[in-house]
């Protein structure tokens, strides 16, 4: 059997769907459960789980510290997750992938610009309506209209520009390291999943990952 390797994104440990699937209420519990499963799989089956260093590793540790996870959990992370920096100078990515990414990014920028223009028109129209005589003073109009429009604009802009694409160095490092190691990507991120598929990488949804590893372990115990 081919050695199994997995490359973990932060969401493999911290995502809310993972907690629900494990039946736990907080990140500390889910992180400890996942790390125990990973440790058992490493010792019994030589299954290795990798994390890009220091981008994703730093992001994950920061998250766990903010959530006040036990020091023992952090020790398990440092012990059982193999930290490695992707060899960014040697990994070969087809030029077509870069072409698709730039094309996708350009389309998102254009959509974001249209959302910005629409937000300005909506602000001007609502300000005009609310500023009619004997209704509200200028300051109230600005506060009401701008707060409403800015909140709506922020959500639409974020979804358009960031949803379903790679928007950070840690996201890219997960894919690069997985490609270098021929490992399966573990994440709950639409952008990572989309580009993992385009790179021909195996992808495992974060909420399924602990159960996949546990299935390997259960089968081994039956031998």
From Swiss-Prot:
InterPro entries: RNA_free_RNase_P (IPR014856)
Example of a GO MF term: ribonuclease P activity
This protein's record includes keyword Nuclease: yes
Transmembrane helix recorded as keyword: no
Assigned EC number: 3.1.26.5
SS bonds (residue pairs): none
A biological process from GO: tRNA 5'-leader removal
Native species: Methanococcus maripaludis (strain C5 / ATCC BAA-1333)
Function (record text): RNA-free RNase P that catalyzes the removal of the 5'-leader sequence from pre-tRNA to produce the mature 5'-terminus.
Protein name, per record: RNA-free ribonuclease P
Reactions that this protein is recorded to catalyse: Endonucleolytic cleavage of RNA, removing 5'-extranucleotides from tRNA precursor
Similarity comment text for this entry: Belongs to the HARP family.
Keyword annotations: Endonuclease, Hydrolase, Nuclease, tRNA processing
């Amino acid at each position: 059997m081919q050695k199994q390797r997995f490359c973990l994104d932060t969401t493999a440990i911290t995502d809310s769907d993972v907690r629900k699937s494990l039946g736990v209420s907080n990140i500390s519990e889910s992180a400890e459960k996942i790390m125990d499963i990973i440790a058992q799989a490493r010792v019994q089956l030589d299954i290795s789980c990798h994390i890009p260093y220091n981008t994703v590793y730093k992001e994950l540790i920061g998250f766990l510290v903010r959530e006040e996870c036990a020091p023992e959990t952090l020790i398990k992370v440092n012990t059982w997750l193999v930290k490695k920096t992707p060899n960014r100078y040697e990994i070969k990515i087809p030029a077509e992938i870069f072409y698709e990414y730039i094309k996708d990014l350009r389309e998102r920028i254009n959509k974001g610009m249209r959302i910005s223009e629409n937000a300005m028109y909506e602000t001007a129209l609502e300000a005009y309506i609310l500023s009619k005589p004997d209704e509200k003073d200028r300051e109230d109009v600005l506060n009401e209209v701008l707060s409403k429009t800015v909140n709506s604009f922020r959500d639409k802009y974020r979804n358009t520009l960031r949803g379903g694409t790679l928007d950070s160095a840690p996201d890219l490092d997960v894919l690069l390291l997985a490609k270098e190691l021929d490992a399966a990507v573990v994440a709950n991120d639409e952008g990572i999943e989309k580009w993992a598929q385009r790179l021909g990488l195996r992808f495992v949804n974060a909420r399924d990952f602990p159960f996949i590893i546990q299935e390997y372990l259960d089968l081994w115990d039956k031998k």
